[in-house]
Amino acid sequence: MELKVIDAKGQVSGSLSVSDALFAREYNEALVHQLVNAYLANARSGNRAQKTRAEVKHSTKKPWRQKGTGRARSGMTSSPLWRKGGRAFPNKPDENFTQKVNRKMYRAGMATILSQLARDERLFVIEALTAETPKTKVFAEQVKNLALEQVLFVTKRLDENVYLASRNLPNVLVLEAQQVDPYSLLRYKKVIITKDAVAQLEEQWV
């Protein structure tokens, strides 16, 4: 499998031979769906909560007598039937949303995503990703020269200047190879990987 190598202006300058096991795998939509769902579920903080009828601050006085008013019987205003009453089946912050994905599935999923990106010509290789100064304006110009709008950069080791210069750009994300996840790969229109990061990804996932 060959991946296109681009220069600083976004022009194709050559190609890089890569592992077929990682970049030429058949697409498995069901597996990708499961990986992304698990990633998003595991990212949940689980802090949502509502109150039960016992926890809502209301008077326990009976609103009106049981019989003779013609209205439906009612015990207290904290009932779930009442406006501003408690919830019948409230969410609690101790809910566990964790979904486990075994290593074999995760490797296969990452490989199928990278392979599809390569087939769709959304995946490119660049020699290196550096920034002389931690200036967002300068780095934004570099991204503009690459003719990219929404891009994920993957490097072997994150340069401090690159991190500082890119962190305030809304459509740019820079990750180290060991931090790459399925959701980020699919979220961005283009994925640019440095040559040394390609080697590390092959070492990790093949």
UniProtKB/Swiss-Prot annotation:
Recorded coiled-coil stretches: none
Superkingdom classification of source: Bacteria
Membrane-crossing segments per the record: none
Keyword field: Ribonucleoprotein, Ribosomal protein, RNA-binding, rRNA-binding
BP-aspect Gene Ontology terms: translation
Gene Ontology cellular component terms for the protein in this record: ribonucleoprotein complex; ribosome
Biased composition (Basic residues): 59-70
Residues annotated as signal peptide: none
Annotated region described as Disordered, given as residue ranges: 46-89
MF annotations from Gene Ontology: rRNA binding; structural constituent of ribosome
Classification via InterPro entries: Ribosomal_uL4 (IPR002136), Ribosomal_uL4-like (IPR013005), Ribosomal_uL4_dom_sf (IPR023574)
Stated family: Belongs to the universal ribosomal protein uL4 family.
Binding partners and assembly: Part of the 50S ribosomal subunit.
NCBIfam families with a match to the protein in the record: rplD_bact (TIGR03953)
Function: One of the primary rRNA binding proteins, this protein initially binds near the 5'-end of the 23S rRNA. It is important during the early stages of 50S assembly. It makes multiple contacts with different domains of the 23S rRNA in the assembled 50S subunit and ribosome.
Protein name per its UniProtKB record: Large ribosomal subunit protein uL4
Organism: Neisseria gonorrhoeae (strain ATCC 700825 / FA 1090)
The organism's taxonomic lineage, starting at the top: Bacteria, Pseudomonadati, Pseudomonadota, Betaproteobacteria, Neisseriales
